[in-house]
Amino acid sequence: MEIPNEEIKFLKKEDIKNINLNGMNKKERYEIWKKIPKVELHCHLDLTFSGKFFLKWVRKYNLQPNMTDDQVLDHYLFTKEGKSLAEFIRKAISVSDIYRDYDILEDLAKWAVIEKYKEGVVLMEFRYSPTFVSSSHGLDIELIHKAFVKGIKNATEMLNNKIYVALICISDTGHSAASIKHSGDFAIKHKHDFVGFDHGGREIDLKDHKDVYHSVRNHGLHLTVHAGEDATLPNLNTLYTAINILNVERIGHGIRVSESEELIELVKKNNILLEVCPISNLLLNNVKSMDTHPIRKLFDAGVKVSVNSDDPGMFLTDINDNYEKLYIHLNFTLEEFMTMNNWALEKSFVNDDIKSKLKTMYF
């Protein structure tokens, strides 16, 4: 696991006016994206890995021995456009087959933190689902959590604490009241390790589970849920429930807010940030093209949005690929990217002391 030798020279606000992106090639632009001090709020730790990392563990466990490396990646991962959230979930469940012991989880967490630092992330809120990770091979969720926390701690120490990492707990398998409550209880039990609670996977209306979310909040954790992502849902009820009943502070994805002027005004009134994941939305067929992605409409309407990578292991992408897409297809500027990262820092679930320190250092 390679530790970067040189520190990233992050851009300051005053540096931006001297940078002309139009005169740069792709490689030069990526150097700029890396130097933006990024706050990433929506990334699934349990689905953050490189193709090389994934193949290492597939071969170690002798899975798919008759497939070439390319065939393995195509079989498990989700790198092509035009599929669906349902197909993505099916593939993600198949990926969980590699979660066979706690060593891989510690290794994965360590790798993920180091890679995020290399990408120029200064504050990283990872999220993971204990029930998802344990689903294939019955790993103990307490030991899963211990492995992830240990891997994160080891990586941040290796990096001399140059990246701050926080954790969000997800409830996402089963969707029964018992399953969601179990995840909520787990988050509360480990509230000193988690900063927030989420619901992911298949998008559902969570109104019948409001008591779990209110209980989690009452124990000091912040709330965000996946909502307004799935373009196939017949209405926007998941968003209204998230805002009006769960009283979330952020929404995972939330791009369908753009379909309703009422919702646009509602998220602005409630100071809710949308954790937007552009490449994910395209690959899961929730937007027709990057040129028509609603993040531009939302940003221009004054909705707080941030840029995120979602499941970079499944897509074999990173956070800077998302910046490149937004620049090429929607003409986002460096000033606008800095604004979004300021919003992300403001709406992060970490404590105010950490926010103040990071703001002084980078913003």
UniProtKB/Swiss-Prot annotation:
This protein's pathway: Purine metabolism; purine nucleoside salvage
Enzyme class: hydrolase
Transmembrane portions of the chain: none
Its EC number(s): 3.5.4.4, 3.5.4.31
GO cellular component, one term: cytosol
GO biological process: adenosine catabolic process; hypoxanthine salvage; inosine biosynthetic process; negative regulation of adenosine receptor signaling pathway; purine ribonucleoside monophosphate biosynthetic process; purine ribonucleoside salvage
Recorded catalytic activity of this chain's protein: adenosine + H2O + H(+) = inosine + NH4(+); S-methyl-5'-thioadenosine + H2O + H(+) = S-methyl-5'-thioinosine + NH4(+)
Binding site for Zn(2+): 42, 44, 226, 310
Cofactor annotation comment: Binds 1 zinc ion per subunit.
Keywords: Hydrolase, Metal-binding, Purine salvage, Zinc
PROSITE patterns: A_DEAMINASE (PS00485)
The UniProt record lists the keyword Ubl conjugation: no
Obligatory cofactor(s): Zn(2+)
Regulation of catalytic or functional activity: Inhibited by coformycin and methylthiocoformycin (MT-coformycin).
Binding site for a purine D-ribonucleoside: 44-46, 172, 201, 229, 253, 310
Residues the UniProt record annotates as site (Important for substrate specificity for S-methyl-5'-thioadenosine): 172
Region ranges (Gating helix loop): 170-184
Pfam family, one: A_deaminase
GO molecular function: 5'-methylthioadenosine deaminase activity; adenosine deaminase activity; metal ion binding
Role this protein plays: Catalyzes the hydrolytic deamination of adenosine to produce inosine. Unlike mammalian adenosine deaminases, also catalyzes the deamination of 5'-methylthioadenosine (MTA), a by-product of polyamine biosynthesis, to produce 5'-methylthioinosine (MTI). Plays an essential role in the purine salvage pathway which allows the parasite to use host cell purines for the synthesis of nucleic acids.
UniProt family annotation: Belongs to the metallo-dependent hydrolases superfamily. Adenosine and AMP deaminases family.
Name this protein carries in UniProt: Adenosine deaminase
Organism in which the protein naturally occurs: Plasmodium berghei (strain Anka)
